[in-house]
């Protein structure tokens, strides 16, 4: 398989999480800046944000279920 999984460093994850906390959607300019400073490609950052939003939806769904259950 030519597809490999990117393993982010703790620092990269922390910076991406901080950015996500600030805004769930990243601008093109900010994506370019982050890519440079974190030594990642813009594509990797785009995909990290997509995955992180999906994770948040999943977490929120679980919360909904917990609230609805008696």
Swiss-Prot record:
PANTHER family referenced in this protein's UniProt entry, alphabetically: HOMEOBOX PROTEIN CDX, HOMEOTIC PROTEIN CAUDAL
GO biological process, alphabetically ordered: animal organ morphogenesis; anterior/posterior axis specification; cell differentiation
DNA-binding region(s), residue ranges: 1-60
Protein family per UniProt: Belongs to the Caudal homeobox family.
Name of the gene: CDX
Gene Ontology terms, MF aspect: DNA-binding transcription factor activity, RNA polymerase II-specific; RNA polymerase II transcription regulatory region sequence-specific DNA binding
Endpoints of the signal sequence: none
Record-level GO cellular component terms: nucleus
Keywords: Developmental protein, DNA-binding, Homeobox, Nucleus
Subcellular location: Nucleus
InterPro entries documented for this protein: Caudal_homeobox, HD, HD_metazoa, Homeobox_CS, Homeodomain-like_sf, HTH_motif
CDD domains assigned to the protein according to its UniProt record, in alphabetical order: homeodomain
Name of the protein this chain belongs to: Homeobox protein CDX
Keyword DNA-binding: yes
Coarse class of the protein's main subcellular location: nucleus
């Amino acid at each position: 398989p030519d597809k490999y999984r990117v393993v982010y460093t703790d620092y990269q994850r922390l910076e991406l999480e901080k950015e996500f906390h600030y805004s769930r959607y990243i601008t093109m300019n900010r994506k370019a800046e982050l890519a440079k400073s974190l030594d990642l490609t813009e594509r990797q950052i785009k995909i990290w944000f997509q995955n992180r939003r999906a994770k948040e939806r999943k977490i929120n769904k679980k919360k909904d279920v917990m609230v609805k259950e008696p």
